[in-house]
C-alpha cells in the first residue's frame, strides 16, 4: 500500500469525493524519450526513422496528463529536429497557440535532443543525479523489471527515471543492453502483440503513474 510518510499529497477531490489515497505526487520524477536512432528495420539493419506529427502531439498530451517532467524527442538529423521544432512552434507561439491553447500547454514539456546521451545528461543537470534508464520490448531479458516494481520506485525513491521508447522495429541490441532495466512486455488478452508506440506510451504511463484504480 501507499506509505503516507513517503508521499507528497495533492489534496485533490473529484465529484466531491476525497481521492487523496489514489491521486498523489510520486517522489521520483519521470522522464520519457522517443528514440529515432539507432533503430532496426525489418531486415535488422540500423536506420534512422522519421519524426511523425502524431508522435509529437499524442505523446506530448499523454506526458502532461501523467505529470511527466520532460518528453525528449531524440533524433540525430538536424533537419528532422528543425521540422519538429517548426511543428511545435506553430502550437506554442503561432496561430495554433490561440486556436487550441490546450495543445500549447502539452508542448511545454517537450525537448528536442540529438542523442540518448544528451537526454541523460540533461536530466542529470536538472536533478543532480544520473537517472535510472529503462526501455520497453516485446521480449523478456535478464534485467526485465515489472511495472509494479518500477511504480514502487517512483512512489518511494527520489532517483529520477527515464523510460525510452523505440520507433521502427526497435532499438539495436547493443543500445538495449546499455540500459539499467527493460520493462516487461505489455500483454493483452489476445495473441496480437504489436502496438503502436503511441499506444504503448499511454499504457505504460498509466501503469506507472495512473490512478490506483485497484484500491477503489
Language model segments and positions:
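Flexible glycine-rich surface loops and low-complexity tracts that mediate binding to linear polymers
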Residues: 1
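Short polybasic linear motifs
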Residues: 4-17
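Terminal alpha-helical anchor/extension segments at protein ends
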Residues: 19-21
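RNA substrate-binding interface of SAM-dependent RNA methyltransferases
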Residues: 24-138, 202-214
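Short, glycine/charged-enriched secondary-structure capping and boundary segments
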Residues: 47, 86-88, 147-151, 177-180, ...
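Conserved acidic residues
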Residues: 69, 131, 160-161, 180
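Long, charge-patterned amphipathic alpha-helical coiled-coil/hairpin "stalk" segments used as oligomerization
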Residues: 134-175, 185
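Structured adenosyl-cofactor binding patch, chiefly the S-adenosyl-L-methionine
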Residues: 169-216
Amino acid at each position: 500500500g501507499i506509505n503516507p510518510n513517503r508521499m507528497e499529497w495533492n489534496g485533490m477531490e473529484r465529484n466531491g469525493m476525497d481521492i487523496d489515497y489514489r491521486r498523489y505526487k510520486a517522489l521520483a520524477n519521470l522522464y520519457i524519450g522517443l528514440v529515432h536512432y539507432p533503430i532496426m528495420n525489418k531486415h535488422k539493419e540500423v536506420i534512422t526513422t522519421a519524426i511523425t506529427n502524431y508522435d509529437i502531439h499524442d505523446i506530448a498530451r499523454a506526458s502532461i496528463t501523467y505529470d511527466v517532467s520532460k518528453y525528449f524527442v531524440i533524433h540525430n538529423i538536424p533537419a528532422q529536429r528543425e521540422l519538429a521544432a517548426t511543428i511545435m512552434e506553430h502550437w506554442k507561439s503561432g496561430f495554433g497557440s490561440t486556436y487550441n491553447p490546450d495543445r500549447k500547454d502539452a508542448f511545454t514539456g517537450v525537448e528536442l535532443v540529438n542523442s540518448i546521451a544528451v537526454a541523460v545528461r540533461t536530466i542529470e543537470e536538472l536533478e543532480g543525479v544520473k537517472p535510472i534508464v529503462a526501455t520497453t520490448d516485446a521480449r523478456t531479458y535478464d534485467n526485465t523489471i515489472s511495472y509494479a516494481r518500477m511504480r514502487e520506485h517512483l512512489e518511494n525513491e527520489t532517483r529520477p527515471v527515464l523510460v525510452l521508447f523505440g520507433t521502427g522495429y526497435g532499438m539495436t541490441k547493443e543500445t538495449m543492453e546499455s540500459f539499467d532495466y527493460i520493462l516487461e512486455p505489455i500483454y493483452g488478452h489476445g495473441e496480437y502483440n504489436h502496438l503502436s508506440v503511441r499506444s504503448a506510451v499511454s499504457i505504460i504511463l498509466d501503469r506507472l503513474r495512473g490512478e490506483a484504480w485497484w484500491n477503489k
